[in-house]
């Protein structure tokens, strides 16, 4: 049996052109925030969801109102789970009717501290961020790819 070992280089100097979709833009913003903003982002989507994400990552408030931005809710829920501090993430009345239980359960399985403030399974959420304790979870195969991607983005922040 052949064994292959892949190791990351110390640094990568390159430019990557991505389309400016809201999902790619929001994921790039989260990855950049997790990496202490080490790269310059250009060509981000100008949609409301991306503007909400930029504001949420930069304003430093303990309560984050993502309005109706579903991608921001999913990516920020995972992001806040691994960043120090206690924050509340909320949104519009409609956002508070959109389920997020599958993602919250997966993050809790990794050791995240997330509380439902009003109704179980739905925003708003109180999240206390810290390094996650586990590195293995199970997800149903039919969940949103944004749930999966937000969990993958958090992988380096597990023990």
Give the positions of each predicted feature.
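Structural preference for solvent-exposed beta-strand-turn elements
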Residues: 1-159
């Amino acid at each position: 049996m052949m064994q292959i070992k892949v190791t990351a280089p110390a640094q990568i100097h390159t430019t990557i052109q991505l389309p400016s979709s809201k999902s790619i833009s929001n994921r790039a913003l989260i990855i950049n925030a997790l990496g202490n903003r080490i790269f310059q982002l250009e060509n981000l989507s100008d949609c409301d969801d991306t503007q909400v994400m930029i504001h949420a990552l930069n304003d430093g408030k303990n309560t984050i109102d993502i309005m109706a931005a579903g991608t921001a809710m999913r990516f920020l829920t995972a992001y806040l789970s691994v960043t120090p501090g206690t924050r509340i993430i909320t949104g519009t009345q409609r956002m508070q009717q959109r389920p997020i239980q599958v993602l919250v359960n997966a993050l809790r399985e990794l050791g995240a501290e997330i509380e439902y403030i009003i109704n179980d399974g739905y925003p708003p959420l109180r999240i206390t961020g810290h390094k996650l304790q586990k590195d293995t979870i199970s997800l149903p195969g039919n969940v949103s790819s944004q749930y999966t991607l937000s969990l993958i983005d958090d992988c380096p922040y597990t023990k």
